[in-house]
């Protein structure tokens, strides 16, 4: 009797664990569900009880199927099951290279574990994801006519995209200005405000760009006229009286407080702190609302005096020395 129990009990324990019915898990990162010329897709598989036996990924369209990935995993013995409990595949899907045309398709995923269910074939999990293959770039149609911009000035362009886009707007040299829908009833019509830097001349390339949900990108020029502008040149005299009065308020900046002289404090504020401020304003401007939050032109405060102009080119003199040059923004 003891011998029977010694044999039956371990077998029962093994059967209990090896015949478990918990199916493996599949997680797919596929946002948005559109495949362009090339798309990176991450697929994660897990089976904490019996371990992963095999994974398979295929792409099906119009009755044609191509295997995108297939992988078998090692067995670690009757007690443990599979040697691998979790794994992930990084897939690069390129439809055209595999002979697929644009249109609706199905991504299929399957994973099996090392359980003894289904006549030792294991538990299986199967997942389908409907995707849209789109390898064509969006087309752009400019609706506005006048796009005249001076150096340091701004302009606006109204345009239509042929399909929903992840991003669209105006590229001015190295600067990108996003466009947004919502200003017009037609959701395909977008409005983009853009600017020409004070240091960007009439030869600066200005292009309309769009990237659709599949990552396909298009760009096109549009009629525009860029005007050169001469900015005011100004020389400012920096005195000890001014430095002793103004600089202490900047001692909250560690670099300024550590400076050895008032003149050095001024140079740090006028250069490094100024550049940090420009960078902060640029970062804030990257996250714009998709609506116009003002009405009419921007005006100077009533009864206020004009102290400086945009992009004034300033020379700073201390005694008989030129100590700095900056552009006032």
Give the ranges of each region predicted by the language model.
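Surface-exposed loop/turn and intrinsically disordered segments
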Residues: 1-188, 193-201, 206-232
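Polar/charged, compositionally biased leader and regulatory segments
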Residues: 86, 216-319, 323
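C-terminal soluble interaction/assembly domains
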Residues: 324-329
């Amino acid at each position: 009797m003891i011998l029977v129990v010694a044999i039956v009990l371990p077998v029962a324990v093994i059967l209990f664990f090896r015949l478990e019915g918990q199916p493996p898990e599949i997680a797919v990162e596929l946002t948005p569900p559109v495949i362009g010329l090339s798309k990176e897709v991450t697929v994660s598989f897990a089976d904490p009880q019996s371990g992963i036996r095999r994974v398979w990924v295929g792409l099906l369209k119009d009755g044609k199927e191509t295997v995108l990935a297939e992988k078998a995993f090692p067995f670690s013995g009757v007690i443990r099951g599979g040697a691998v409990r979790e794994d992930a595949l990084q897939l690069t899907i390129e439809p055209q290279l595999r002979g697929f045309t644009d249109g609706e398709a199905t991504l299929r995923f399957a994973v099996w574990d090392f359980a003894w269910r289904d006549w030792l074939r294991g538990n299986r999990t199967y997942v389908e994801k409907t995707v849209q293959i789109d390898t064509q770039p969006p087309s752009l149609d400019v609706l506005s006519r006048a796009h005249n911009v001076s150096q340091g000035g701004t302009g606006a362009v109204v345009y239509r995209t042929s399909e929903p886009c992840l991003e669209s707007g105006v590229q001015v040299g190295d600067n990108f200005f996003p466009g947004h829908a919502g200003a017009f009833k037609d959701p395909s019509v977008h409005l983009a405000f853009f600017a020409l830097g004070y240091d960007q001349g009439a030869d600066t390339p200005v292009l309309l760009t769009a990237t659709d949900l599949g990552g396909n990108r298009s760009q096109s020029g549009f009629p525009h006229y860029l005007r050169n502008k001469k900015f005011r040149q100004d020389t400012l005299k920096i005195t000890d009286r001014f430095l002793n009065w103004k600089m202490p308020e900047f001692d909250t900046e560690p670099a300024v407080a550590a400076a050895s002289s008032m003149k050095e404090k001024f140079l740090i504020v006028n250069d490094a702190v100024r550049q940090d401020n420009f960078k902060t304003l640029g970062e804030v401007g990257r996250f714009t609302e998709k609506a116009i939050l003002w009405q009419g032109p921007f005006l100077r405060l009533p009864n206020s005096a004009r102290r400086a102009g945009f992009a004034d080119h300033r020379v700073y003199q201390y005694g008989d020395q030129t100590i700095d040059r900056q552009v006032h923004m």
